[in-house]
């Protein structure tokens, strides 16, 4: 008796790399942490600290700081490394800018960081909401500085840049995230050169000293590719750089290919400084808004 072809065998499940000791963090508790959570819940606000499973969430919350996530908690992109939910987002909340400013005032923030999901469903990519948030913050906290971490605003990055730079945030950040070769797998829907062009546009409008970019390490890049990306970011005009370790949010995301040691991060930070970056944060737990300040 003949039988049909057998189904191909599945490749064995790849065991995740063991997490090294330097990535283990102590989880604090107490009133500062509870207070930030209450403020977020009361205003129906979100933080990227929660949505992206940031390893520094407890440290930052305990210090009374947070990075606000605007335009909802559902992203229209499907980056292979990101923990933020993907799907069809809710309509833009018109009360969000006012609630965010209120929470920032109650927290007594001196430097407010705002980021967002990608909103490819919106004509302006959400740029108008960034502008409204900054305007509300200026009214509520006139002496606070502001930092925006923005998406690539496809298909109209120039219009978005003009709008956001018109209200002059203190820091303009956009993340290249990874090396050119890994973009198709890690950042489908995004283009490496477009992200560099956005940094250049911001540097032309605000000055490179105000422009920041971040890379996550451990997605499968080579050291030569990594150094090339650092050079590309500098050539684009950014003068602030953050380098941090990729931590896979789940087994459905791109697995960690390599853990970089603190010594390796220090060497990469020194390389970036040798190129002329003015402010470099480089370490396993560093993230885009880690120790954010003007």
Q: What spans do the regions from the language model cover?
A:
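Auxiliary Fe-S-binding modules of radical SAM enzymes
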Residues: 1-67, 98-105, 132-143, 159, ...
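Active-site mouth loops of central-metabolism enzymes
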Residues: 70, 81-94, 147-156, 216-223, ...
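Short, solvent-exposed loop/turn segments at secondary-structure boundaries
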Residues: 91-93, 123-128, 185-187, 223, ...
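Conserved alpha-helical substructure of the radical SAM core
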Residues: 86-113
């Amino acid at each position: 008796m003949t039988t049909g072809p057998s189904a191909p065998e599945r490749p064995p499940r790849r065991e995740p790399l063991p997490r090294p000791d330097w990535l283990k963090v102590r989880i604090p508790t107490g009133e500062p942490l509870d207070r930030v959570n209450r403020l977020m819940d009361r205003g129906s606000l979100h933080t990227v600290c929660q949505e992206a499973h940031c390893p520094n969430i407890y440290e930052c919350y305990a210090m009374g700081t947070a990075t606000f996530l605007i335009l909802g908690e559902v992203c229209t992109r499907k980056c292979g490394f990101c923990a933020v939910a993907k799907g069809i987002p809710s309509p833009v909340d018109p009360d969000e800018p006012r609630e965010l400013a209120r929470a920032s005032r109650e927290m007594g923030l001196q430097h407010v960081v705002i980021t967002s999901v990608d909103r490819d469903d919106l004509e302006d990519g959400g740029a108008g909401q960034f502008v409204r948030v900054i305007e509300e913050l200026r009214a509520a906290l006139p002496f606070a500085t502001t930092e925006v971490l923005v998406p690539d605003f496809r298909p109209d990055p120039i219009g978005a840049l003009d709008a956001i730079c018109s209200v002059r945030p203190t820091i303009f950040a956009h993340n290249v995230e990874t090396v050119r070769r890994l973009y198709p797998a890690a950042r489908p829907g995004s283009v490496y050169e477009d992200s560099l062009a956005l940094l250049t546009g911001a540097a032309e409008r605000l000055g490179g000293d105000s422009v920041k970019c971040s890379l996550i390490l451990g997605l499968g890049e080579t050291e030569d590719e990594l150094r090339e990306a650092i050079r590309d970011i500098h050539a684009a005009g950014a003068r602030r750089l953050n380098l941090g370790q990729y931590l896979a949010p789940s087994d459905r995301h791109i697995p960690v290919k390599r853990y970089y040691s603190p010594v390796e991060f220090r060497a990469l930070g020194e390389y970036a400084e040798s190129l002329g970056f003015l402010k470099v944060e480089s370490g396993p737990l560093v993230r885009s808004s880690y120790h954010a300040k003007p």
